[in-house]
């Protein structure tokens, strides 16, 4: 899940940053994706505000599937938030059997339609025998500490930090 949290910083979406990591039974990475503009399109050329941006953005789960290598049969996915119905279908169709989902909420309003979508996702999981596991995010800071300690040990923490700061600056954030 730590890798998913790090990957979501790459998203240029101004409201919601999601990421998805697909791994095999031995936890080897098969695919990585984050929500963002379609491939080959200049990021500056597309709308960044809803609802227009939705025509140009791809969800992290489908990007992870598109960017994957090898079979996803029997794989596990780590998603920073709850999957939508379209992404759930894509994951099931590609053989994902376990989904860990995290605390990042999408900016979708809590409407009867979004409640129905969540019920549909849970129903699909049940019907397809896909295990849904809510990631206990209360300890996510410990995960980040482990990741940063590892990156520091490998001597690449400053480079990763610089990439995150650069991403935040593009989004108008502060260091």
Predicted regions and their residues:
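Zinc-dependent deaminase catalytic domain
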Residues: 1-175
């Amino acid at each position: 899940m730590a890798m998913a949290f790090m990957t979501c910083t790459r998203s240029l979406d101004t409201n919601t940053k999601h990421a998805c990591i697909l791994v095999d039974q031995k936890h080897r990475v098969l695919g990585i994706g984050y929500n963002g503009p379609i491939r080959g399109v200049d990021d500056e050329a597309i709308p960044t505000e809803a609802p227009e941006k939705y025509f140009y953005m791809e969800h992290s789960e489908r990007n992870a599937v598109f960017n994957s290598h090898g079979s996803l049969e029997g794989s596990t996915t780590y998603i920073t938030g709850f999957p939508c119905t379209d992404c759930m279908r894509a994951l099931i169709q590609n053989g994902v059997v376990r989904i860990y989902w995290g605390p990042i909420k999408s900016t979708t309003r809590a409407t009867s339609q979004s409640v129905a979508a969540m019920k549909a996702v849970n129903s699909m999981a049940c019907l397809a025998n896909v295990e849904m596991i809510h990631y206990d995010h209360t300890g996510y800071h410990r995960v980040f500490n482990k990741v940063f300690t590892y990156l520091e040990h490998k001597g690449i923490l400053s480079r990763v930090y610089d990439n995150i700061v650069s991403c935040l600056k593009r989004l108008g954030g502060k260091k």
